[in-house]
From Swiss-Prot:
The gene is CAL. CAULIFLOWER may contribute to the shape of the floral meristem. This trait has likely been selected by early farmers during the domestication of modified inflorescence structures. Residues 1-61 form the MADS-box domain. This is Transcription factor CAULIFLOWER. Residues 183-207 are annotated as: Disordered. GO terms for biological process: cell differentiation; flower development; positive regulation of transcription by RNA polymerase II. It comes from Brassica oleracea var. italica. PANTHER family: SERUM RESPONSE FACTOR HOMOLOG (PTHR48019).
Length: 251
């Protein structure tokens, strides 16, 4: 027997309603995936259960891209329509509020998914997309971290080179100043030695020459008083010799 037509009304039995929802949801997601592959269409599907759980499907890697595309398209259509009354303005504000509220809820839900929370309502395909997004984000984070570390290392190397060059220049200046100070010190010492040279000692005569009056012929020994001049002169009288000879002949 063929399958009969299902009557379109609310299922009163909670268990049957939950089972039907699970089956129909899986079929709906499958059909959305098939039409996106076969027709190369951009498909997004959002389903809330009667308990408030969210189920979604997106042919793109990120649901936000599809929603942004939809928002741009709907905004462009609204711009073509000229509002003619205050009622239209109020309606636009209500639509904008609903849109922003839905977007905030979607962002909060995605944030929970990125943190590993509330994953029970996500299908395998969605988990795979989430995993790919996290891997891509992790690669970007690691690449940025490595770039910052490389830049920091290069900065430290340049700083080290500058410090070494500065130290070398300071050491050279210190050596030059020390050389100048040593030169000034040597010049000062030479000038001091030239100003304090001891007088040359006077030559001293032999004491025998100084005490012998016969070696000072009519002169005066340096250091003697003038009264010794008469004593130092050579006595050339022959009286003692003459007296000596007379005594010899007398004998």
């Amino acid at each position: 027997m063929g399958r009969g037509r299902v009557e379109m009304k609310r299922i009163e039995n909670k268990i049957n309603r939950q089972v039907t929802f699970s089956k129909r949801r899986a079929g709906l997601l499958k059909k959305a995936h098939e039409i996106s592959i076969l027709c190369d269409a951009e498909v997004s599907l959002i389903v809330f259960s009667h308990k408030g759980k969210l189920f979604e499907y997106s042919s793109e890697s990120c649901m936000e891209k599809v929603l942004e595309h939809y928002e741009r398209y709907s905004y462009a259509e609204k711009q073509l329509k000229v509002p003619d009354s205050h009622v239209n303005a109020q309606t636009n504000w209500s639509v904008e509020y609903s849109r922003l509220k839905a977007k905030i809820e979607l962002l909060e839900r995605n944030q929970r998914h990125y943190l590993g929370e509330d994953l029970e309502s996500i299908s395998i395909k969605e988990l795979q997309n989430l995993e790919q997004q996290l891997d891509t984000s992790l690669k970007h984070i690691r690449s940025r971290k490595n770039q910052l570390m490389h830049e920091s290392l290069n900065h430290l190397q340049r700083k080290e080179k500058e410090i070494l060059e500065e130290n070398s220049m300071l050491a050279k200046q210190i050596r030059e100043r020390e050389s100048i100070l040593r030169t000034h010190q040597n010049q000062s010492e030479q000038q001091n030695r030239s100003h304090h040279v001891a007088p040359q000692p006077q030559p001293q005569l032999n004491p025998y020459m100084a005490s012998s009056p016969f070696l000072n012929m009519g002169g005066m020994y340096q250091g003697e008083y003038p009264t010794a001049v008469r004593r130092n002169r050579l006595d050339l009288t022959l009286e003692p010799i003459y007296n000596c000879n007379l005594g010899y002949f007398a004998a």
